[in-house]
Amino acid sequence: MNSLLMITACLALVGTVWAKEGYLVNHSTGCKYECYKLGDNDYCLRECKQQYGKGAGGYCYAFGCWCTHLYEQAVVWPLPKKTCNGK
């Protein structure tokens, strides 16, 4: 019984730690949201929260808004069968 409880607790913890992350994407163009102030960035944080909910985080990484703490079905860049501006 104790072993089952420990396994369940570990699986719940792993699910929490391994949340999805990725670049914020514009669904109409297929492009990443650009940013220029690397690191903590109010713009990226605001856009990630607006698109993915209050629990999401965001910062500027490699000149694109990187969102954290996303739900597993969240759509992030790159979009399947859609390239940025047809490139």
Curated annotation (Swiss-Prot):
GO terms for biological process: defense response. GO terms for molecular function: calcium channel regulator activity; sodium channel inhibitor activity; toxin activity. Residues 20-85 form the LCN-type CS-alpha/beta domain. The keyword Transcription regulation does not apply. It is found in: Secreted. Expressed by the venom gland. Disulfide bonds join 31-84, 35-60, 44-65, 48-67. The keyword Secreted applies. PROSITE patterns: LCN_CSAB (PS51863). One of its GO terms (cellular component) is extracellular region. Residues 1-19 form the signal peptide. The modification Asparagine amide is found at residue 85. Beta toxins bind voltage-independently at site-4 of sodium channels (Nav) and shift the voltage of activation toward more negative potentials thereby affecting sodium channel activation and promoting spontaneous and repetitive firing. This toxin had also a depressive action on the classical calcium current activated at high membrane potentials. This toxin is active on mammals. Has the structural arrangement of an alpha-helix connected to antiparallel beta-sheets by disulfide bonds (CS-alpha/beta). Belongs to the long (4 C-C) scorpion toxin superfamily. Sodium channel inhibitor family. Beta subfamily. This is Toxin Cll2b. It comes from Centruroides limpidus.
